[in-house]
A protein has these predicted regions:
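P-loop/Walker A NTP-binding region and its immediately flanking N-terminal helices
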Residues: 2-189
Length: 189
């Protein structure tokens, strides 16, 4: 898809840019429509789902998780549902209600306490330092969740910048590292 100032004047058609942007938005929305939003929609990951649901029900969870597996198995979806369950005002049976403002904000990608970070694109030390700094800003709700997608893409200096936050996290902070290459995650994590 074309975007930016170059698309505005393609073949002298200023509306082309608007049509392409509308199509891109429609594809993004379609993608999110079919992404699972609650535990019952996750298929083939019953063991992981049961463990995370039980932790939410007991209100006793770890501060860091590595969700590893091939592309398309649901790592990021599981992390998002877990984040929704941890931040949901009306969570029941270890899962998010899907209706409160917190749940809706997660689905739209605009939750104030759930930060999704693409490590494949933002893999450097400066970005990691900013994540670590923001980790100590308290949450507005019961938990703050960092979902690090493609975590294997982080550089060694970036992991070093996150290490102190991982070793001594604030009590409200949960990390979910999603990766297709768990061997690339440092052993110290």
């Amino acid at each position: 898809l074309l975007s930016g100032p170059y698309a505005v004047t393609i073949n002298g058609h200023p509306a082309l840019h608007q049509r392409l942007e509308a199509r891109k938005e429609a594809l993004t929305i379609l993608y999110n429509v079919y992404r699972p939003h609650n535990w019952t929609e996750i298929v083939g990951q019953e063991a992981v789902v049961n463990i995370l649901k039980a932790q939410v029900q007991r209100k006793s969870w770890g501060h860091a998780y590595i969700l590893a597996g091939p592309s398309g198995v649901g790592k990021t979806s599981i992390a998002r549902i877990f984040a929704a369950a941890l931040t949901c005002a009306k969570a029941r049976a270890g899962g998010p209600c899907g209706k409160c403002g917190s749940c809706k904000a997660i689905v739209s990608g605009a939750h104030w306490d759930v930060i999704e970070y693409d490590a494949a694109s933002n893999r450097g030390i400066d970005e990691a330092r900013e994540l670590a700094r923001r980790a100590f800003l308290g949450p507005m709700g019961p938990a703050k969740v960092y979902i690090i997608d493609e975590a294997h893409g982080l550089t060694s200096p970036a992991w070093d910048a996150l290490l102190k936050t991982l070793e001594e996290p604030p009590p409200y902070l949960v990390w979910a590292f999603c990766t297709t290459n768990p061997a690339a995650i440092p052993a110290t994590v």
